[in-house]
Each structure stands twice: as structure tokens, then as C-alpha cells.
């Protein structure tokens, strides 16, 4: 009897763990994806448009030879990308509106807008 209860507890524990993992998986996925390029310290497209109230995967390609840092004080986002590399990160969900972002290392020339519709 003791062995049956122990086996049952292990089975229930494994099922609960699988249920928890499967619930967490959708949180890792983005509801939308966009691409962003930085070249000559300028972001393209500018403005970047994304849907409101949606988790968005951003793929950022740095075509410069120097490191850039995608940064926004408006929505508290940031991501470092070395020269010639591509990184992905998530932003949102954000409310509808216009937000600013820039390259932290070249803020004065790299300001861009994020339009959330």
C-alpha cells in the first residue's frame, strides 16, 4: 500500500509540473514580431509601429561596427547589441501612444519613435 501511494504522489507531482510548464510556455511567445535596423546610428524604420496591448518580439540588427544600445526612458526598455550582430528582445504590452527610443551611446542623433496603435 505504501508503494502505491508513493507512486501515485510521484505521478500527480509530475502531472502538476507538466501542467505548470505548459502554462508558462505561451508567456515566452510573442504575439507579434517586428524588425529594426540601426545603421549610421539611425534606426529604421522610424517610426516603428506595433500593436497596442501586445507582447512584441523585436529583432534588432546592428549594421554599424560599434556597439549600440536600444534604450527607452518612456517604456523602460533596453538592449545592447555589438557591431555587426543581431539580437532579439521583447517589449510590451504597451498602451496606445507614441514613445521615444534611442541608441544610448549616440542619443542626440539616434532618437526615434515607437507608435503603438
Q: Residues of each region from the PLM?
A:
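N-terminal edge beta-strand
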Residues: 30-53
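Beta-strand-rich interaction surfaces with strong enrichment in secreted/lumenal proteins
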Residues: 46-48, 76-80, 90
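Short beta-strand/loop motifs in extracellular/secreted proteins, especially
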Residues: 56, 66-68, 110-112
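Bacterial N-terminal signal peptides that target proteins for export
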Residues: 2-13
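Extracellular/periplasmic metallocenter environments
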Residues: 35, 82-117
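Asparagine-centered strand-capping/turn motif at beta-strand->loop junctions
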Residues: 60-62
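Bacterial N-terminal signal peptides
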Residues: 11-22
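Sec/Tat signal peptide C-region and signal peptidase I cleavage site
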Residues: 23-29
Amino acid at each position: 500500500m505504501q508503494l502505491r501511494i508513493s507512486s501515485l504522489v510521484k505521478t500527480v507531482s509530475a502531472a502538476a509540473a507538466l501542467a505548470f510548464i505548459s502554462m508558462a510556455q505561451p508567456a515566452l511567445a510573442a504575439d507579434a514580431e517586428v524588425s529594426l535596423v540601426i545603421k549610421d546610428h539611425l534606426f529604421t524604420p522610424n517610426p516603428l509601429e506595433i500593436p497596442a496591448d501586445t507582447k512584441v518580439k523585436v529583432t534588432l540588427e546592428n549594421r554599424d561596427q560599434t556597439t549600440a544600445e536600444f534604450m527607452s526612458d518612456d517604456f523602460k526598455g533596453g538592449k545592447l547589441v555589438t557591431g555587426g550582430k543581431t539580437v532579439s528582445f521583447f517589449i510590451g504590452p504597451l498602451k496606445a501612444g507614441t514613445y521615444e527610443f534611442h541608441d544610448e551611446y549616440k542619443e542626440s542623433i539616434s532618437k526615434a519613435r515607437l507608435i503603438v496603435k
